[in-house]
Amino acid sequence: MSVIEKLIKPAHLIDMRDIIREGNPTLRAVAEEVSFPLADEDILLGEKMMQFLHNSQDPVMAEKLGLRGGVGLAAPQLDISRRIIAVLLPNPEDENGNSPQEAYALKEVMYNPKIVAHSVQDAALADGEGCLSVDRDVPGYVVRHARVTVDYFDKNGEKHRVKLKGYKAIVVQHEIDHINGIMFYDRINETDPFAIKEGMLILE
């Protein structure tokens, strides 16, 4: 049984054992574009990836399955070298602890996503970044674009263009890096990990 056949079995729930770790060559390969109309297995894989993110953000399911929380997942992290990413960004509660009107700021499975424009200004998360494929802490500012325009296709083959900024832009860039064989720590300044470039936004 191939990797993808195992992952898309109806009863299978993706867990941390399915996620490959740094050092695996798939994480350093430039992934292949998917073709349209999508094969059923590509649609099912996208659905399974989104299901994993939902489970990882659910305290009960995360504990049951032993999941680390995640907001994004790329197919290469599952040892599938295809240009598929899933992003699930919850909206925060308000200052009174009330649930947001919209549960998610971004919820999408993107096929063949591509950054088509970006800001001159850079940005980085104040607390740095982590990755489900990296089991160690790598401190430092991960320098990315503050704003990006991304083209992608959905599972029906329809093309979309989204303009993203802030945390949404950071997360999508992290996942697009995965399909290009780039790890987040490649973007940390080796000699001065917390160097701040002129005009760079630090996102709390």
UniProtKB/Swiss-Prot annotation:
<keyword id="KW-0408">Iron</keyword>
<feature type="binding site">
    <location>
        <position position="178"/>
    </location>
    <ligand>
        <name>Fe cation</name>
    </ligand>
</feature>
<keyword id="KW-0378">Hydrolase</keyword>
<dbReference type="GO" id="GO:0046872">
    <property type="term" value="F:metal ion binding"/>
</dbReference>
<protein>
    <recommendedName>
        <fullName>Peptide deformylase</fullName>
        <ecNumber>3.5.1.88</ecNumber>
    </recommendedName>
</protein>
<dbReference type="InterPro" id="IPR023635">
    <property type="entry name" value="Peptide_deformylase"/>
</dbReference>
<keyword id="KW-0648">Protein biosynthesis</keyword>
<feature type="active site">
    <location>
        <position position="175"/>
    </location>
</feature>
<dbReference type="GO" id="GO:0006412">
    <property type="term" value="P:translation"/>
</dbReference>
<comment type="similarity">
    <text>Belongs to the polypeptide deformylase family.</text>
</comment>
<dbReference type="GO" id="GO:0043686">
    <property type="term" value="P:co-translational protein modification"/>
</dbReference>
<dbReference type="InterPro" id="IPR036821">
    <property type="entry name" value="Peptide_deformylase_sf"/>
</dbReference>
<dbReference type="GO" id="GO:0042586">
    <property type="term" value="F:peptide deformylase activity"/>
</dbReference>
<dbReference type="Pfam" id="PF01327">
    <property type="entry name" value="Pep_deformylase"/>
</dbReference>
<comment type="function">
    <text>Removes the formyl group from the N-terminal Met of newly synthesized proteins. Requires at least a dipeptide for an efficient rate of reaction. N-terminal L-methionine is a prerequisite for activity but the enzyme has broad specificity at other positions.</text>
</comment>
<feature type="binding site">
    <location>
        <position position="131"/>
    </location>
    <ligand>
        <name>Fe cation</name>
    </ligand>
</feature>
<keyword id="KW-0479">Metal-binding</keyword>
<feature type="binding site">
    <location>
        <position position="174"/>
    </location>
    <ligand>
        <name>Fe cation</name>
    </ligand>
</feature>
